[in-house]
Curated annotation (Swiss-Prot):
Its main location: membrane. It is a multi-pass membrane protein. GO terms for cellular component: plasma membrane. Its cofactor is heme b. GO terms for biological process: heme A biosynthetic process. This is Heme A synthase. Heme binds at H292, H352. The keyword Metal-binding applies. Interacts with CtaB. The lineage of its organism: Bacteria, Pseudomonadati, Pseudomonadota, Alphaproteobacteria, Rhodobacterales. Belongs to the COX15/CtaA family. Type 2 subfamily. Keywords: Cell membrane, Heme biosynthesis, Iron, Membrane, Metal-binding, Oxidoreductase, Transmembrane, Transmembrane helix. The keyword Membrane applies.
Length: 381
């Protein structure tokens, strides 16, 4: 049995025969594809914004400013000076304040509080828009056949993401344990799931952008080898995104600022200084940055191989998609080097993360077109 990947189209719809005289409900569902696609596009844009705001929240060390998890009542921020002072007093009970921010006044605390509150509030908005859209389409029976489960999935994953977000924050809301930030592996889990959700939304948008009949015909032209290679590239890119989260989680991007060497050496000094040994792969800044660097080189090398194969596609749109992937990855490699050599300032680090989103979506697009080519070849037939 062939392996299935997280974004592979496995719909049973392709097995259905189109009715010669579709009924009113079928026509209604077919017509709703555009509306559902717009709804997904709104969710997609909000998730991209969520990733950006989450990145800025981490880079500004704002993520621990709200020490409680109140999914509903937390939507209302402090409204009076007394309420603000109460929130500040809660923050003063955790290690981050005692070890990093004893200099803070209430006005300084408000700045980091708003970042974290905005991040959580955006999550609530995403959940609300998903629920309104999903149940609205469900009640009006506008969801195309076979799509109910698919459209339910982002909502379920969003709920899980909220729980993971608090699990992540809870790792840093400590006293006496020396934690000044969230656990890096929990941060990687949180960011990784955000990219998974974004991937599903993008894939569904690609599918709904074409008629079911067109997809059925296009699948007969599927480029199996290119599809498999792009799937591998997608998974490799996902791994690199997780490694990037580990780097951000422990500020490893600032540990060595020379390139191509690290501290004047190929391998960073004291790579296994933490006990037990396995913790170095998650908590040793030098080793974590080294792994992220090497993975980046390997990802780029593999991308070149995939790109060269993609250029041989018989379809112009597929060729263009793989050209775009190669261009975006080339840009990302350069930005990554600049990020290291400038000690990861916030403005460059957030651009690095934003381009990672671009690379992710472009790889998905190229993978989609290798599975469902647009039936116009480079020879014009």
């Amino acid at each position: 049995m062939s392996n299935r990947t997280i974004f592979e189209e496995v719909s049973s719809d392709s097995k259905q025969q189109s009715s010669p005289t579709p009924g009113g409900i079928d026509r209604k569902r077919r017509g709703a594809r555009g509306a559902i696609r717009v709804w997904l596009a709104v969710l997609f844009a909000l998730v991209v914004a969520m990733i950006a705001v989450g990145g800025l929240t981490r880079l500004t060390d704002s993520g621990l400013s709200i020490t409680e998890w109140r999914p509903v009542t937390g939507a209302v921020p402090p409204m009076s000076e007394a309420e603000w002072q109460a929130e500040f007093e809660k923050y003063k009970q955790i290690d981050q304040y005692h070890l990093m921010n004893t200099w803070m006044e209430l006005s300084d605390f408000k700045t980091i509080y708003w970042w974290e509150w905005g991040h959580r509030q955006l999550g609530r908005v995403i959940g609300l828009i998903w629920a309104l859209g999903f149940f609205g389409f469900l009640v009006t029976r506008s969801i195309p056949t076979g799509w109910t489960g698919r459209l339910l999935l982002p909502g379920i994953l969003g709920g899980v993401q909220g729980a993971i977000g608090w699990w992540m924050v809870a790792s840093g809301v400590t006293l006496g344990e020396g934690m000044t930030s969230v656990a890096s592996y929990r941060l990687a889990t949180h960011l990784g799931l955000a990219f998974v959700i974004l991937g599903f939304l993008a894939w569904y948008m690609f599918l709904l952008g074409r008629e079911e009949r067109d997809l059925m015909q296009a699948r007969r032209l599927k480029e199996e080898k290119l599809f498999g290679m792009s799937t591998g590239l997608l998974h490799f890119a996902f791994l690199q995104i997780l490694l990037g989260a580990l780097v951000a989680g422990i500020d490893a991007g600032r540990s060595y600022t020379d390139w191509p060497l690290m501290g004047g050496q190929i391998f960073p000094p004291r790579p296994f200084m933490i006990e037990p040994l396995w913790k170095n792969f998650f908590e040793n800044p030098g080793l974590v940055q080294f792994i992220h660097r090497v993975a980046g080189y390997l990802l780029f090398a593999f991308a070149v191989v995939v790109w060269l194969r993609g250029r041989r596609s018989a379809h112009k749109a597929t060729q263009f998609a793989f050209n775009a992937v190669f261009a975006a990855l080339s840009l990302q490699l350069v930005i990554g080097i600049v990020t290291v050599m400038t000690a990861a300032p916030v403005e460059i680090a957030i651009v690095h993360q934003a381009v990672a989103v671009l690379v992710w979506v472009l790889i998905l697009r190229a993978r989609f077109l290798s599975a469902y080519p647009v039936a116009t070849s480079i020879k014009g037939h």
